[in-house]
């Protein structure tokens, strides 16, 4: 893991969290229980504090950063998709931020909300619970249904299970030169399907 103290402030990582070795944690970063931090994620706590609460995940290539005296927080069971950028914002409990979305300074995403992939949430946005936010700039397009939340929670459960699986079974290796006969397929632990299927 690439974990760095900055001016004497050392990142805090709960022993049940999983941090991919290519992720970078700098300075004032606090990682909670059962958190998954994916490959190439960058959590740069050199100005503001970065907090990822229990059961949340920050997937491949995500960036967290913030201004001085402004915390950037992913609350419990938050789900942050590949390539998202979080800057001095708060992601509410059990919410999902879609792939390559950007959440700007002072924005608050309400609990149990979903930010659609590729959305841009403006600075100072004040969201409410159970909103579907979409677009650039992101707008409330509809309310979140119980079915939406079931799908979101299954996806988050996959990452919570992946945290344990990676801690137990992710091993650096050298590649094979050809696929072996009867090559096994890796699978998730739930029956979650992509939207639309």
From Swiss-Prot:
Residues 177-197 are annotated as: Disordered. Residues 188-197 have a biased composition (Basic and acidic residues). Pathway: Amine and polyamine metabolism; carnitine metabolism. GO terms for molecular function: transferase activity. Pfam families: Hexapep (PF00132). InterPro entries: CaiE (IPR023446), Hexapep (IPR001451), Transf_Hexapept/Carb_Anhydrase (IPR050484), Trimer_LpxA-like_sf (IPR011004). Overproduction of CaiE stimulates the activity of CaiB and CaiD. This is Carnitine operon protein CaiE.
């Amino acid at each position: 893991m690439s974990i760095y103290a900055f001016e004497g402030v050392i990142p805090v990582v709960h022993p049940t969290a999983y941090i991919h070795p290519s992720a970078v944690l700098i300075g004032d970063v606090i990682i909670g229980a059962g958190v998954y931090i994916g490959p190439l994620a960058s959590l740069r706590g050199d100005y503001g504090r970065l907090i990822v609460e229990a059961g949340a995940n920050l997937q491949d290539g995500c960036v967290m950063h913030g201004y001085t005296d402004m915390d950037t927080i992913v609350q419990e069971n938050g789900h942050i998709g590949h390539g998202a950028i979080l800057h001095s914002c708060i992601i509410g409990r059990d919410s999902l931020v879609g792939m390559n979305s950007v959440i700007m300074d002072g924005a608050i995403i309400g609990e149990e909300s979903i930010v659609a992939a590729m959305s841009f949430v403006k600075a100072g946005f004040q969201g409410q619970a159970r909103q579907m936010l979409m677009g650039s700039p992101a707008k409330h397009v509809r309310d979140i249904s119980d079915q939406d939340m079931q799908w979101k929670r299954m996806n988050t459960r996959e990452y919570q299970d992946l945290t344990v699986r990676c801690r137990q079974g992710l091993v650096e290796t050298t590649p094979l030169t050809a696929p072996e006969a009867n090559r096994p397929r890796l699978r998730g632990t739930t029956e979650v399907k992509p939207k639309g299927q």
